[in-house]
From Swiss-Prot:
It comes from Influenza A virus (strain A/Gull/Maryland/704/1977 H13N6). The probable endonuclease active site in the N-terminus and the basic amino acid cluster in the C-terminus are important for the shutoff activity. The C-terminus acts as a nuclear localization signal. The C-terminus is recruited to host protein complexes involved in nuclear Pol II RNA processing. Gene3D superfamilies: Influenza RNA-dependent RNA polymerase subunit PA, endonuclease domain. Keywords: Decay of host mRNAs by virus, Eukaryotic host gene expression shutoff by virus, Host cytoplasm, Host gene expression shutoff by virus, Host mRNA suppression by virus, Host nucleus, Host-virus interaction. It comes from the Viruses. GO terms for molecular function: RNA binding. One of its GO terms (biological process) is viral RNA genome replication. This is Protein PA-X. The record marks 195, 198-199 as: Important for efficient shutoff activity and nuclear localization. Its main location: host cell. Plays a major role in the shutoff of the host protein expression by cleaving mRNAs probably via an endonuclease activity. This host shutoff allows the virus to escape from the host antiviral response. Hijacks host RNA splicing machinery to selectively target host RNAs containing introns for destruction. This may explain the preferential degradation of RNAs that have undergone co- or post-transcriptional processing.
Amino acid sequence: MEDFVRQCFNPMIVELAEKAMKEYGEDPKIETNKFAAICTHLEVCFMYSDFHFIDERGESIIVESGDPNALLKHRFEIIEGRDRTMAWTVVNSICNTTGVEKPKFLPDLYDYKENRFIEIGVTRREVHIYYLEKANKIKSEKTHIHIFSFTGEEMATKADYTLDEESRARIKTRLFTIRQEMASRGLWDSFVSPREAKRQLKKDLKLQEPCAGSPTKVSHRTSPALKTLEPMWMDSNRTAALRASFLKCPKK
């Protein structure tokens, strides 16, 4: 699964996911399913924000190519992917500036057009079940919830899907592609089932045990993540590197 993640996600997303896991004391090399889930969630958040701007009249517009007009601002503020301290700083700044209610939990995005925080969910289960779990945890009518599944289903607060149909279709297509690529590598079942994941982990660890009298092979594979990557939110064109195309999973 770790190799799949590093091959199939943009290196910037991989690095952000690694940092997020290490912040909570988690190891991407061990908790590989969580690693894949975090990368998927990050990518959906970036795709949700990508191409969407607000013009000088306050109208939401989509700009897919060319140099964006200087008067345009990003419609969405990306909160997911930042370290907790910086994320709360951004949330507090937004609340102080707009007067919106401060959320109890860190949201994923802020929509400057609708003036609301957004919680993005990506689930391997039934969308309505995951939606209810999110709503029960957040316990706030102010935070908008939008859930996507790997089967193309989605569910949002009051059936308000925020984005246009084409933008949502891009996200659904990407999720379906990830599912298909996982399945072709025999990874999907363990990704969906925690029990199967534990069984696979035990199997992998057993296979990694050095045999008596056999030389131990040590892998020195270098992470493709950019070592000098600047945080994407510090760049005015923070999603430009992700726009052209998300890396397509190479076939074995």
